[in-house]
Amino acid sequence: MTEAKKSLKRTLVGKVVSDKRAKTVTVLIERRVKHELYGKIVGKSSKYHAHDETGEYKLGDIIEITESRPISKTKNWVATRLVQKAAVV
């Protein structure tokens, strides 16, 4: 087989909302889902703590996170790549 194996780990893209903790960033994932009963499109959001070994991701950056083994009590995700740098105001 010449094709690469597909990873079973989930990947999500979201915005860094906190970078105050050492080696950890908090990422806000926003998604739009259809309400089961009424059919209206509603916004849902979740916050995940992701491991950032080098501390390269800053507040406002759009990053990709990948599911991993538990690193601590609340960290099960690792920041893998920078999608978009935060805009300087």
Swiss-Prot record:
Q: Name one GO cellular component term.
A: cytosolic small ribosomal subunit
Which spans of this chain does the record mark as coiled coil? none
For the biological process aspect of GO, one term held by this record is:
translation
Instruction: Summarize the subunit comment.
Output: Part of the 30S ribosomal subunit.
HAMAP family xrefs: Ribosomal_uS17_B
Question: Hey, which family's this protein in?
Answer: Belongs to the universal ribosomal protein uS17 family.
Name-wise, this protein is Small ribosomal subunit protein uS17
Gene that this sequence comes from: rpsQ
